[in-house]
């Protein structure tokens, strides 16, 4: 999508001696995935890994102000982009029989949602669930799956509006309330960790065969609160009068 930065990244890798194939890709377009997969196979012969990294912030609004176009954009990029990536690349990995890896980039929001982030939260939770499912499905074929769940990282996701296609434009996109939220988000992201640190953490985690990859251990206590609430809810169900007659309780 960002041709200029794609060229900069490609040049940097080539100068360090890394073979590169730089292709623009709209991850929400399955046909473009197929095109890139074909080009990658021709360039490298064998493909061993796909990193589903593309993501957008989407609209940040209350539940009663959400619009279909905003939801659709977030779903198509954050969720269907991951689905198309795996659907397209897994057959290539299976084809050579040497095993490989799927790395899906979710978010801490996939472990516990934040206020007014309905569409974003939903897609990231879905990516976590997909990763868990695929990890179990593909392990027998020596294909590993990991899901990266970072908190704030110094990226431009707060400015993903710049890449929103016109067919996904909503009344909310570009509004003052939306811009205000982006400005607040930018401040938090600017104080996040460097992308290079995340990259090193991912390499470390893959070497260890980790399914869940976390980059912000200070969020552990917040996630523990959620899982404690879930555990407490199970305890409540054990005391349920309504469930006493259920054979599956």
Predicted region positions:
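The beta1-alpha1 cofactor-binding region of Rossmann-like NAD(H)/NADP(H)-dependent oxidoreductases
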Residues: 3-4, 24-35, 68
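Substrate-binding pocket helix/loop in short-chain dehydrogenase/reductase
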Residues: 61-63, 67-72
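Active-site helix of classical SDR
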Residues: 86, 123
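Residue(s) in the substrate-gating loop at a strand-loop-helix junction
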Residues: 107
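Active-site-adjacent segment of SDR/Rossmann-fold oxidoreductases
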Residues: 112, 133-143
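Active-site loop immediately N-terminal to the catalytic Tyr-X3-Lys motif
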Residues: 112-118
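SDR active-site lid
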Residues: 140-213
């Amino acid at each position: 999508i960002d041709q200029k930065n794609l060229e900069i990244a490609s040049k940097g890798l080539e100068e360090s001696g890394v073979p590169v194939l730089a292709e623009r890709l709209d991850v929400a377009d399955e046909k473009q995935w197929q095109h890139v997969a074909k080009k990658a196979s021709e360039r490298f012969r064998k493909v061993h890994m796909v990193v589903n990294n593309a993501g957008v912030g989407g609209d940040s609004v209350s539940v009663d102000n959400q619009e279909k176009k905003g939801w659709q954009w977030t779903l198509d990029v954050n969720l269907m982009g991951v689905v198309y990536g795996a659907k397209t690349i897994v057959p290539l990995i299976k084809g050579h029989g040497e095993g490989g890896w799927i790395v899906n980039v979710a978010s801490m929001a996939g472990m516990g949602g934040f206020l007014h982030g309905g569409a974003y939260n939903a897609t990231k939770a879905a990516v976590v669930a997909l990763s868990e499912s695929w990890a179990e499905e593909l392990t027998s074929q020596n294909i590993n799956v990991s899901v990266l769940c970072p908190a704030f990282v110094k990226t431009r996701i707060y400015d993903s509006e710049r890449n929103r296609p016109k067919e996904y434009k909503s009344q909310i996109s570009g509004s003052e309330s939306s811009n205000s939220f982006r400005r607040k988000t930018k401040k938090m992201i600017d104080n996040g960790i460097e992308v290079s640190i995340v990259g090193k953490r991912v390499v470390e985690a893959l070497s260890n065969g980790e399914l869940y990859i976390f980059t912000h251990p200070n969020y552990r206590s917040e996630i523990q609160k959620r899982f404690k609430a879930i555990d407490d809810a199970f305890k409540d169900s054990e005391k349920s009068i309504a469930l006493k007659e259920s054979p599956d309780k």
